[in-house]
Design a protein with these regions (language model features):
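A structural signal for small-residue-enriched, beta-sheet-centric alpha/beta enzyme cores
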Residues: 3, 20-78, 102, 106-205
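Phosphate-interacting basic helix/loop segments used at nucleotide- and nucleic-acid interfaces
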Residues: 82-106
Length: 205
């Protein structure tokens, strides 16, 4: 949220003219048609519209509810925040600024709160990364019993993002958390899009 605010990704619902589709969905489920319209505009495609919930694929390729459009922690009753336009670029800029000002080579993760299919509750995941490979591949390594791991890839950026949320919290007004001790922070090809499963590998699309 802090990155979206800093980059001005805030929308005034008073300036939004809802489409026919937005009005129909809003009427059926007692939603604000302007908010629905913003969600549709931030979406590449609608995955599911049911029970008052909009599950979409965002322009970034993320599958989530409401395209990440959020009214929480945004001043004003008529304003909502959007996801950063390019979270990876935002992370790279922050990383570069930190290196220039502090002389430190750091990894940067921009996170947001997502729900999870078949699991109750939300958790933070990485939507933008810089300097850190978001996936940690153990394939080919052996476990303590000598078994060679064939398919074992950890979403390390998501794990760090989720751990950081325990520190930052939802109501504490702490926008940044520092994770120390992770050694791999010089991966220049980092992108959070590598965390998105390709459609050809997805059994549920």
């Amino acid at each position: 949220k802090i990155v979206s605010k800093a980059e001005g990704n805030i929308v005034d619902l008073g300036q939004i003219e809802p489409s026919i589709l937005a009005k129909e969905f809003a009427t059926q489920y007692d939603k604000d048609p302007r908010l629905v319209e913003v969600v549709l505009r931030e979406s590449r495609r609608v995955v599911r519209m049911d029970r008052g919930i909009l599950v979409v694929e965002t322009k970034h390729g993320f599958i989530c509810a409401n395209a990440g459009v959020d009214a929480s922690n945004v001043p004003g009753d008529e304003r909502v925040s959007l996801l950063p336009v390019d979270p990876d670029l935002s992370a790279r800029r922050i990383r570069s600024d930190l290196k220039d000002s502090l002389g430190l080579t750091l990894g940067v993760i921009i996170s947001d709160t997502f729900g999870r299919p078949w699991r109750m509750g939300n958790t933070d995941i990485a939507i933008g990364v810089a300097g850190i490979n978001p996936l940690l591949d153990y394939t080919g390594q052996t476990d303590i019993n000598g078994y060679t791991l064939r398919v074992s890839v950890s979403a390390i950026a998501d794990e760090i993002a989720s751990a950081a949320e325990l520190v930052a919290g939802k109501l504490t007004q702490i926008p940044v958390a520092i994770a120390k001790g992770y050694p791999h922070v010089e991966y220049e090809e980092a992108t959070a899009r590598s965390l998105v499963r390709d459609g050809s590998m997805d059994l549920f699309r």
